[in-house]
Amino acid sequence: MAAEISAKTVKELRDKTAAGMMDCKKALQESNGDFEQAMESLRKKGLASANKKSDRIATEGIIESYIHMGGKLGVLVEVNCETDFVARREEFQELAKNIAMQIAANPAVKFVSLKEIPQSIIDEEKKIELEKDDLSNKPQEIKEKIVEGRIQKRLNEMILLEQSFIRDSDITIEELVKRNIAILGENIQVRRFERFNLGEGLEKREDNFSEEVEKMKKK
């Protein structure tokens, strides 16, 4: 006997996945009312749909800014889509805003994706890990596996798309983008970003009070 699917459950699934009402109802019916299974089914369909669109050219979009409270931290991010129509959509602009906030919240993030990381950085991380004392007595094969895992973890900390979304830790930024691709029907790409910290790279002046007093006496 098929499980009874309530309108409330359908709405909850829609709120959680941003999929259409009919798609949510169908997913719940196919999973016999299992909410988690229905959610996973919709997630996979959304990612599959997004992957099909990922090769399409995206030259429209917006440059979103985020200034943190106090004005000491700011972010600029360029998010691209295929048409100006989608660029003006509230959902797209909300996505860009969330991504800008994500960058502000993750100071370790330096790159959009893995392919942007220079080989020199990867080689340096590998060198650091291989020289750690806790690996000195490990067999070479085991050592290489441990190093590979540590490097991947370190690189993931630098990659925007690998970060857990600050508003929903169950998904990554990559999954958030793909969900919006499924919703809006266009390829969406985070092209580039820049993070600004007030005074970054500048030497702060440290006045010596005693020296200042002596200078004043000589005047």
Swiss-Prot record:
Report the GO terms under cellular component: chloroplast; mitochondrion
Entries under Pfam families matching the protein: EF_TS
Q: Which residues form a coiled coil?
A: none
* InterPro entries xrefs: EF-Ts_dimer_sf, Transl_elong_EFTs/EF1B, Transl_elong_EFTs/EF1B_dimer, Transl_elong_Ts_CS, UBA-like_sf
Could you list this entry's UniProt keywords, alphabetically sorted: Chloroplast, Elongation factor, Plastid, Protein biosynthesis
Recorded GO molecular functions are: translation elongation factor activity
Subcellular localization: Plastid, Chloroplast
Similarity comment text for this entry: Belongs to the EF-Ts family.
Q: What does this protein do?
A: Associates with the EF-Tu.GDP complex and induces the exchange of GDP to GTP. It remains bound to the aminoacyl-tRNA.EF-Tu.GTP complex up to the GTP hydrolysis stage on the ribosome.
Extract the HAMAP family matched here: EF_Ts
Its protein name is: Elongation factor Ts, chloroplastic
Q: Which gene encodes it?
A: tsf
